């Protein structure tokens, strides 16, 4: 699994997090509250402007009530799909 020249991992991660949040039916504000993060930072992640740390991914997953491994697998699949 390698990123092609046109791929931006931040954008893929952001789309996956945004999709998971949408699937959970919660707002950025609610996710921020539950995950202990700022809503603006979640917005930056979802727009592909910031790359979350592993700690942040775990916090987001806790707030989304999904396993981090599920999110990472979805990211991996999206990278492969776009390669």
Question: What spans do the regions from the language model cover?
Answer:
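Short basic helix-loop element that most often maps to the first helix and adjoining turn
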Residues: 15-34
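Helix-turn-helix DNA-binding elements, focusing on the entry/boundary residues of the two helices
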Residues: 17, 28, 39, 54-57
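A detector for short, charged/polar N-terminal pre-domain segments
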Residues: 1-12
